[in-house]
């Protein structure tokens, strides 16, 4: 077995994964066409016509089937039965009798179904309490408050659905339910619901057209969507296709509907009629659930029914490089050569220990690959096809007869194979996969991509569970993921992970996902964002897009933007048909990679914790604003900003040449992850977004566990240094509790509480490991740990250095506690009086005024002539300068210098930039008596005009510049006196005496005035 090389689909096809090459689908299509044709007699149920592609998919996989036949709506209610746990309506439709069962499942909401039910069943149903009114209405109520009111109307009926607050959400009448019959059996079902004005509908699986689906029609039939083409070829496309179609719809009217069917179907959400939406499925199952809570509550109930997300191994949340097999085989001359070249490249960037690499096309039997990857602790992820030819399968299952192999058969000819697809419902499939990967899982194989899960033809027969392709076409990803998940659990050393392109309801319990195939550039990136959020709203929690897009080569700028975006996805993974190695994307590619590689490593514990929480609650890691804030109508359809891991407000920059970007801030206080900027929410604000910066803000009251290096700085290298457990915290608007799952059984609780207007406390529960705290959004005037006051430090602390707190501006305070035994930290908030020294500066070129006017939208382009001149800023007076910020738009100078002077003649160079890549360059000047600042020796690239939008300078943030309230000042004064530190307290003593004198004088004046008023009042009475 060790020398057997795998083959799948075709021997050559195994190296060509993506549809840009179209070889694999073509071969499969030929196989499907050559399969035994279906013959249907009058005694069999209707068979879909695979050639009737009324949707015009043009996809290289089985076309959308079509079953002809008209619908019969319910024309008569015959009887009702009020049973203990179900309300039964016997109805007539087109001369056929059916029963509709209304129940209240223990997963919440209500369910309406016929005798033909879908795959998912609740553990039980609640007891129904019936309330009858004088006019004959029957009210039924669930434990979660969902209420259904039945009233008979002549020979018909009406069901009114209300939420727990008694608000009517929608109604169902006989004309909204349709069945199509053949030979007395149901062959198609339909449900119509009203569509209100300004109603927003979202979910429906992973989408690429838009986040809000009102006005659109959607195909509920998994296909290879073919959206990995340039935008120009998609501009007029309806884009209704999807790899992961899930019939779950959220309405902003306050409910969620899930149609429990895997059969082929479609939804028409105001496409044909703006007053209604229609769900149609080509199978006998009429079965849907409705939940009436908030969108997140409803999604949790849906997960309770279909399954919560799986927990990935922690290493899977680190950056995972990958690319197309053609790149792996050519970039370094061979697969092994490219792996060695990759390892050298990451070593040079200071990140040698890559957790895992997706090596598409790698031979999993090649010991040389494992030996090479073992040196850097890198796990091997590979491409895993949905099919194997007979000879390959027999090699994995020695002794098994050909007819007994777990291969899908023809539903009309049990001995005829259909496409060599693995029948993953057959127990032998697990044995086969175990024999394929088991030995290699013990030496470094850890999963990879599950691809082409959309190719199951209708005629396929799955003998393992007796289903056919009609139902299994959409359900196939569930079974593939399940088998691989079980095999990896049993064979891998420290867990495995698979990423499926196809998806369906329930698959989230067994596999993670990648967002299909997109083209590079801004348009493809926007589709990735829509796909991730719509998929998350449909229960597909663990996802990661192809960093940089699949087809094409992104610009250096868009590679950087994609790197930033990927760092705030559940899974950070790269893939593409050209190199996705950061060193191939210029200085900006390398620098952005290094920054966000380490920032991601800082956040791995937090993301892993969120994954565990999701597995317990069913809530996704990425949440669109309309799910998080469902009562804000402005968020309907908005996808550009989202919540990540409950605490981060993320706005990926998906426009080229942007240095400013609009961020939508929900109500409440938000604090910049990078700069500590405080923003009061409730509006959309334009913020700085230089090329290496993604706008990420932290929710008020957050307590976020992070792992950081000795420097106690985020995004700093942690290579070959001791790491430290820390917390990122923000000031709470109100009391807030945060849970940190260290593993699936261990949870630490942090509570943030306001003590008063200028003080807040963080309480840590059992299991706390944090020995440092990073406060975002404020300087601090004082910090106490379990009642003991910490000293203020005047230089950046390190993890093993002196305990204390340090702040140099109003954006951040670093607190080094020194141990993890603490229970409470109390932080008194302070504020430095820092002003931009450039505000009153003069310039040697009138045009330069735009760089110091405080308006980030005014710019200064350095022309050919001006690049030869010095850009000189004269401060209002000579002063100490701590930092200088040079801010470039997306068009920047790669080489330039910055110098300072006290007299304009003698200059000291404080920056010699040789590898500039734009963005905000922060220069630590740390100089006294600065009167002039000069930018000079600007080198322009051919055809590029560098553009500045602002230049700023700030003085030192000395102790005298930080202030708190009067009580804090007195507390600090007493502390210094008691500890004999009077030298540092002279200023405070003088200030405090002055304040006390003023206060006493004010009190005396008030008392005397009161006495005078009382005396006058007494005289008047006399």
What are the functions of these language-model segments?
Residues 180, 350-593, 626-632, 638, ...:
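Aromatic- and carboxylate-enriched substrate-binding clefts and catalytic-loop regions
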Residues 865-869, 890-957:
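Trp- and acidic/polar-enriched beta-sheet ligand-binding modules for extracellular glycan
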Residues 999-1022:
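C-terminal membrane-anchoring or membrane-association module
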Residues 767-770, 867-868, 876-883, 930:
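Extended extracellular/luminal ectodomain segments enriched in beta-structured repeat modules
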Residues 34-45, 1008-1011:
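Sec-dependent signal peptide cleavage junction
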Residues 486-487, 495-496, 503-513, 531, ...:
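Catalytic core of carbohydrate-active enzymes
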Residues 832-877, 887-892, 913, 919, ...:
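Disordered, acidic Ser/Thr/Pro-rich linker "stalks" and the adjacent N-terminal cap
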Residues 46-58, 92-94, 101-104, 123-125, ...:
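Catalytic and substrate-binding clefts that recognize carbohydrates or anionic sugar/phosphate headgroups
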